[in-house]
Amino acid sequence: FLHPEFIIQFVHISCIINWSEETKGNVKAKIKELNEQFEEEKGVSMFGTSLGKQWKTYDSDERYSTASLRFNSADIETSIRKTEVVFEPTETGKEYTIDQMGDGLRSLFYISLVDSILDVEGQMVREIEIDPEHTSFNRKPPILTIVAIEEPENHIAPHLLGKLVGNLKDIAGKNNAQAIMTSHSPAIVKRIDPENLRYFRLDRELLASKVRCITLPDEERMQDQYKYIKEAVRAYPELYFAKLVILGEGDSEEIILPKYWEAIHGNTDVSGISIVPLGGRHVNHFWRLLNDLEIPYITLLDLDRERDGGGWGRIQYVLKQLIANGYDRNVLLNTTDSGILTDAEFEGMAGWNVSAITAMQTWIAWLEKYNVFFSAPLDIDFMMLEQMGDTYKATLDTREGPCIDIAQSGKKERITKIENDGEIHSEYETRILKDIKNTLKEEGGDGHTYSPEQQKLMVWYTYFFLNRGKPSTHIAALSQLSDEELKENVPPVLQRLIETADHILKGDKNENCAS
């Protein structure tokens, strides 16, 4: 029995011996000869070829571009046990070992190694089928291998995750393997077909996890909706990890809502809020998906009063989607004055008088009890302009802004000057009528439900939001304001939405139902 200290000293002494060049040359030649003999063995060659091929699909780092099997020992038994993989950028370049890799590349290589083994096992099966008496290996491969990977995002760089997911899909496509991966990373989730996802959520009452499939519209009957929802959940995978999802119309909501929330309650990421733009389309499918996953949500839609399909049409659309999503029709359509709407009355809602603004506002307030809010009277861009128009105008320099030609003076005047002077120009009145049309679209109304000030604001709406990029306009305006100034300038509907979101996150409001 040798004391460990003696062994350590012996190894240390052997490492500092001044070996002759002849001895080092002879050993190197023998090892090279041994490696060549080793690589000629059919089973080794098969595995080495597979390893090199599979590794190229995982990594693109030039230092480790070529992977091959090598060993270094005095006898065949020990050599085989000490077989290792080496990497080299070229045939004559420096060799690297696994130990010299970072954690991420090392993790990636181990997965590549599993991929190689599965590939070889497939070749083993074919060998057994062709000639069972002469095979490269003396064992039968397993019928099925389950490859389970836990949260690879912890060790693998983001730019390599896509390659990893692609290769795991290839592994899962093999006849002898199944791949299972857990992840909290949106970068991974968005690369997985929603139909292949299984969603785990902790049930705090049962103290156990519930497992669910992802609910998508029926592909056969609703092909367009199926494609839209499928791509939407892939584009916004953050919703799976959210404590609360806010469904908005588009890019503007993604800029404005976080800005106000952060001014009032802090970072949306810390709060666990995900804002998903759905463009007002297929809202009931999003609701069904989030209901099935038991993720609470709030919806913010444009009212689009006097636009085609807006106003009463938009309210009717939301009511229909709520009914389709399982809400009680008799409760939803119960009015204070005349009881429950008949089918005929409900079907005719889109044609109700758009000037009945008080009645429309009553329905809007009712739908807020179902966590459906409206940017009124038009959309969130117009609402922000109405709330803090001067802030948006302050982002322009003296050479910017809408202008018109004044026939009387023969000059081009800026709208800002005309508004400040208070002079009446027929050209200005004509411009207002033109931009009312631009704002409400070709099939829209004449703007009679809007006040004179709101009609004038449509000139600025056209300039800021129809002729320029919405996100950049909002960013430029909101970045001028401090958190305190933002708090003082919250549109009332956004104030109510934020309060509702806060109550849901604190657990003191029923989620997605009238209370």
Show where each model-derived region lies:
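Switch/communication elements of ASCE P-loop NTPase nucleotide-binding domains
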Residues: I80, F87-A235, H265, S472-S515
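P-loop NTPase switch/coupling surface
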Residues: F1-H12, T57, D61, H265, ...
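Glycine-rich phosphate-binding loops of NTPases
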Residues: F1-A29, E95, E220-D224, L322-N325, ...
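Switch/connector loops and helix/strand junctions flanking conserved nucleotide-binding motifs
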Residues: L2-P4, I188-R191, L206-R212, E306-I315, ...
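Beta-sheet entry/capping signal
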Residues: E84, L144-I146, Q178-I180, N196-R198, ...
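Acidic, Mg2+-coordinating catalytic modules of nucleic-acid enzymes
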Residues: A232-L247, D251-S515
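Extended helical coiled-coil dimerization/tether regions that scaffold
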Residues: I8-V147
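Short beta-alpha junctions and helix-cap segments that line functional grooves
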Residues: Q54, F71, N167, S183-S185, ...
